[in-house]
Design a protein with these regions (language model features):
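Short hydrophobic/charged patches on amphipathic alpha-helices used for structural packing
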Residues: 63-66
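C-terminal alpha-helical cap of glycosyltransferases
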Residues: 165-167
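Catalytic binding pocket for nucleotide-activated donors in carbohydrate/polymer assembly enzymes
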Residues: 51, 69-70, 74, 78-162
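Conserved catalytic-core segment of nucleotide-activated headgroup transferases in glycan assembly
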Residues: 1-61
Length: 167
């Protein structure tokens, strides 16, 4: 899968290693295959992440897919190809997305959405800074309160933002 490349796996694995209570939920149509799920789990295992910290799921209808967001605290963006629809859906479901400024259009999609909402502080300068931001959130005692507030307000913030301005 081109979005979850080795650099992305390495960054996410570092977050998981440094935030022992964190888990990763990853969904993709290619994960329908048990072989592909095992391959992904093996890539994380090579980097020191136990398989029980990963939840991997394959295709799901849109309603079920949106329900997965209820199990997530913070969405982690891919790079160099960012989310587009998934970034919008995460924000719509009340989740901040951690991303960073990339060097091409396809790696700046998420940051352009976040900068048009109240989530500009979730845009890091690079992959290293994004990892540090994620680890910091995992260890910050105020994070649950911050995330609860965002979960309640992000849909309205997004709807009122430039990102949804149809004029």
């Amino acid at each position: 899968q081109y979005k979850v490349c080795p650099a992305v796996v390495a960054a996410w694995a570092e977050i998981l290693r440094r935030a022992p209570s964190a888990r990763l939920l990853l969904g993709n149509s290619t994960l329908k295959s048990i072989h592909n799920r095992q391959y992904v789990a093996d890539q994380f295992a090579i980097l020191g992440v136990e398989q029980d910290r990963l939840t991997l799921f394959g295709p799901a209808d849109h309603y079920r897919f949106l329900q997965y967001y209820d199990q997530i605290d913070v969405a982690l963006d891919t790079f160099p190809y960012n989310g587009g629809t998934t970034t919008m859906e995460a924000i719509w479901q009340g989740l901040p997305v951690l991303t960073f400024d990339g060097d091409r259009w396809a790696s700046r999609t998420s940051q352009s959405l976040l900068r048009r909402t109240v989530l500009e502080s979730f845009v890091a300068g690079d992959a290293r800074a994004m990892v540090e931001m994620a680890v910091g959130l995992a260890h910050d005692p105020s994070t649950p309160e911050t995330l609860a507030r965002l979960r309640r307000s992000l849909r309205q913030e997004l709807a009122a933002s430039e990102a949804c301005d149809t004029a």
